[in-house]
């Protein structure tokens, strides 16, 4: 085993691009590199000393719980001993539609605030669920690029100051709204008529520090606004360009590094920690050679100025869609007897890194393994990728044939046949025309992130174990010759589809690409999605039948004007172009994951040591349980919250159950059936001395559920004394 120790640094020096690359990478040169490199851990004495924690740990003013994104409650009324008595206290039904809502409610002074499927924000009496007010934020459909609910993945309450009133800060479409918490009315002094533009679209919950509201954009970048006036104070580009630090790590078109994952704030040091996702386009990097900063990074910014303090990159030149996917968690741990402040980085690759808050240096050594080369002409893979030992990965990137399902002989044979036709391995690049198998595009971790037990330094994170099955195919499509006018279908696409799927059909944020659609979907399947919608896409996008045919023709590349001359696809040069066939998965003949369970997990880490304390299956397939199969776990998207009562609450599974686990042992102590699947992390709060646990339960989206999508919010509590 050969390895090389790197000098002390936050991340490897970026790959600087120069001459035009040769058609294919040299495997011999790659094999000559040391097998391992290491980023050494910071000396314990050099780690940032713990600062006072000023958060009110019994409050829930932000969807992530507090500015540190810990989703922790110090309330203790509900315990391991009485959890069996927990039951629904009230259920709210929005009554304005049915859609997947991914926002954890905010609760302040006995009032709960949450979005609805009908693109409104509601205020409820947190003790009874009675509606107090409702405010629509969908007056301008063109302003909402996702055409879905406001506060997609969170909102925040700011209490105001001596001169300015309290406000709810809500992202919706391409705007940030400031609303009066008492009435829902827009606050006129904020921006124009209560809203201010967010250039790259809203998704994650922002954070307020002093007078600065920090948020991120769906399609990238971070922004600092004056929380009092809505004035834009600064903008940090997540895709480095021009004279930016890291601009040399891109060659060609620059896109991605989306901001849907989330952010957190150190209230003492004035630092914002922001997670940015994968570069674009997904799966193919021939047009974006280099490490592609600040994709797949946690970036620390000075909140008052927006200046970068440090960054830590996980996967470099990502061609697998392995986003750093969740809000960084801020916590305090013990190292060599000292209490120190750290921040986490979670990714779909299954990596969990623990970093010093001030310098970004890792708390535990980071092992990097030599990665294989690509055979795609024009592709340039990073020579090393993370292969961490401590903390152990949530899941291992790649695929091991030893994991093939043994659920039945038929299931095993069906999966073995797929594996025989596929590639797989540690950061295995795509081979043209062959499916590539790896664990990652649905996690590992996901956007729902983790919860922190503040006193102990434990971290609770949900994860998925499903194998992606994705094929990269040569792209022979070329753009329309500008000498000819667009077709009717292209015009419709530009008007109604391009804000989500991007002008060149390459996809945007969480929205998939439509390139190469003719190779993977029939006309009927495309038209069905246009009519019925899918995920966040609304139904009846085009109601006129003739217009639908025009749009399908454009998407399937039929009856279009002549293409621009030039080789290789949609560009004017001869750079090879590719597309991928969508986000497929390795499943058996009955649609179950093609690997051995567990398929979904709740994981507990002790971050003082970096070790896993326990792992418990999360979710089940009821029909398999009835057949006698042990708890399998299931694909999940929801996230956990933890209490001082020793309980971890979590939903997010298609079996539509809400569960509580013992925080010390991982034993499942309680569950309840929801009207629809839970689709966000729960919030914990207290009203008049009574503790509640509330969950958004709408199903739909990637969670699914037999009953969804729906429109419910359900609050649980112990019975009132008789």
Per-region residue spans from a language model:
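N-terminal pre-domain segments of enzymes
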Residues: 20-76, 379-415, 565-578
